[in-house]
């Protein structure tokens, strides 16, 4: 079993993930990452033999709009992982997202992706933070 932490409204994320094959549990709470990143969202317990991080991220970006600035900074799009072996899959998905538009800048655990597929050829910026888990505090039952 593995864990992944995603920022966003817990109720919407729980609804999106609770029926996915390979997802064993979804718990709301606060996650803190090594790069001073702190998010409010969900902890996803999943079986990597049944679902991978890319599929989890695909579902995430169907629920969370990474182009809209959240009023609460804890709800800005972010991915917090437990193991460095998860980073290649997160970066693979980021490269997939990059291929949809202009090449982004990336630095210090933050991915800034441009999506040029908009009416009028405007470029929308998508900011996704990611970092390694330091602490997770689940919501009270």
Task: Describe each model-derived feature in a short phrase.
Residues 1-141:
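Flexible coil/turn and secondary-structure edge motifs
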